[in-house]
Amino acid sequence: MKLKSAFSQLMFKYVTVLGLALTLGTAYAQAEKETPAKGVMWEVKSEKNTAYLFGSFHLAKASFYPMPEAVEQAYKQADTLVVEVDTTDAKAAEKTMPLFTYAAPDKLENHISKKTWENLQAMVGSSVVQFQSLKPTIAATALTLSLFRQQGYDASKGVDLHYLLRAKQDKKDIVELESLAFQASMLGSLNDEDADAMLAQTLDGLKNGDILRETADMIEAWKNGDAENLAKILLHAANKDAGSKKLMKILLDDRNPGMTEKIVDMLNKEKKLFIVVGAGHFSGPNSILDMLEKQGLQVRQIK
């Protein structure tokens, strides 16, 4: 049986059950060239080893493939695929879901501001009842996934999942930099103030088109192999306001040191590594690349 992303399947279940049919921001849906992606990849050298780091998008389209020959060769020569998490682990995904939901009689409305609840009601209408069991972070994710599914993006076509499935088929070793439990705990355990801010920001970004526009711009830069522009777009999105800065700190900056430490440890061994991590982790002053360079490793982009 063909493996799929267990976590994305669970998320798809929520999106489907909620019956979401968002049309917000679709006016921006720019004409996208249906061509294979170049992506962004870096070579990292230590005294003992060389690894290749490839920036991923967790949502993608079939038209993104095949990847460039340089990326394919980096994958093929690797003994080990390194990813953020193994999203095909159905048991791990099932175990994480309680961290994202409220047990009755508790509900979402009790944990977010009146304004955020009213904005959610205005956006999803009668489907808002189905949100009551979800924590704000999963509600925000479901809303965003719904919008991008309408634009043709699919978690089952995501770059990390693409290589995970191939690595399993090719019998390569697979190493996680994090775990689903860690990621779920990180998002599911946000205090009410931060979780409310995340959901409120998502609702605003969906309504005004910023989420679609900024993500589409980042994907276009990634497809063109333009790491510099990708970093600029992400930096702009991250510094729009205090809420954006806080969110990016939680999602990227706070996680990068731990992932960097594990990458450095693996580079001190002799395994050939192909590392696939969300492209956002390779951008900015607190990026994984920046931290690797500060530890004396040689980093260069493969163009």
Task: Report the location of each language-model feature.
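Structured, acidic catalytic/metal-binding patches in enzyme active sites
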Residues: 40-250
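N-terminal secretory signal peptides that target proteins for export/translocation
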Residues: 1-9
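Boundary at the C-terminal end of the N-terminal hydrophobic targeting segment
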Residues: 27-31
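Bacterial N-terminal signal peptides
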Residues: 11-25
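Short secondary-structure boundary/capping elements
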Residues: 36, 63-66, 254-258
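N-terminal low-complexity, Pro/Thr/Ser-rich intrinsically disordered segments
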Residues: 32-40
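A cross-kingdom marker for long, charged
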Residues: 245-303
